[in-house]
A protein has these predicted regions:
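Short substrate-entry loop that stabilizes the transition state in hydrolases
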Residues: 133-192
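Membrane-embedded alpha-helical segments of integral membrane proteins
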Residues: 1-17
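Internal/C-terminal transmembrane anchor helices
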Residues: 22-47
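Divalent metal-coordination and catalytic microenvironments
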Residues: 91, 172, 226
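Alpha/beta-hydrolase active-site loop
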Residues: 186-188, 192-238
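Domain-level recognition of soluble alpha/beta enzyme cores
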Residues: 41-152
Length: 238
């Protein structure tokens, strides 16, 4: 969208030329110049970036899991007694063959995720849309090169996301590590499940009269998330 001003300015120039045999007025000329310059400035200040090359000897595969802990009620939706804790966990790992595979996008569900990201940063809702054109260095796969490899679990910060540190995960995976990174539901900026159900951010404690105990409960939820992930990894490995 950064080139939208340029895209519209070109047909406008043609229309002005067809309707007027006389030179453009100063106002019209200034408007067209403004449109052209705006497009180039936007494309320079908000570029479609690329993640750095992981640099290791392995290609990087990725797979996203949706896991539900049926033994644990959802702490953040206590009003719904039928809601169990569910999380999205993405893994990055070394793979051999990437033939006929396309790199995965940097962010999934950008049409949903973008507006939430913009609101958190106080930006216009359309601004993160360009991230839809950013790809990662990871390829969708379930075939790790070996079954036994060192495993790391990365837990993001409050309002964070598993997506924010992908360059580091790809760096590690290309060097022989398997990295699991969850979105801690309701702690993350936004968690989007495969059916597009949303877990929004609900971990704000500013001004809460019992903030210490509330945060303690949230940290316990995260601890149980990690324990649950370890159990799921063991199941995958058997």
């Amino acid at each position: 969208w950064q080139f939208t001003p340029v895209t519209y300015s070109l047909p406008l120039m043609y229309v002005f030329h067809k309707l007027n045999n006389q030179p453009l007025t100063l106002l019209k000329s200034s408007f067209l110049i403004f449109m052209l310059v705006s497009g180039f400035i936007l494309s320079s200040t908000i570029p479609v970036f690329q993640l750095p090359n992981p640099g290791g000897r392995h290609k990087v595969g990725t797979h996203t899991f949706h896991w539900v802990d049926s033994l644990r009620d959802e702490h953040f939706t206590h009003e719904d007694t039928t809601d169990f804790r569910e999380i999205i966990v993405q893994a990055w790992f070394p793979i051999k063959d990437i033939q006929e595979l396309e790199p995965e996008p940097y962010l999934d569900f950008i049409e949903i995720r973008g507006s939430t990201m913009a609101a958190a940063a106080g930006l216009p809702s359309f601004l993160p849309g360009y991230l839809n054109y950013v790809t990662s260095n990871s390829f969708k796969s379930t075939l790790c090169i070996e079954k036994r490899m060192p495993v790391l679990i990365f837990s993001h910060g409050i309002t964070g996301s598993r997506h924010l540190h992908q360059a580091m995960f790809e760096f590690l995976a290309s060097r022989g590590y398997i990295v699991f990174a969850p979105d801690h539901s309701y702690d993350a900026n936004i968690t989007i499940f495969p059916n597009k159900k949303i877990a929004d951010y609900r971990s704000e404690i500013t001004g809460h009269p019992d903030s210490v105990n509330v945060r303690k409960m949230q940290m316990e939820t995260r601890t149980f998330d990690i324990s649950f992930i370890l159990d799921q990894i063991n199941k995958i490995n058997t």
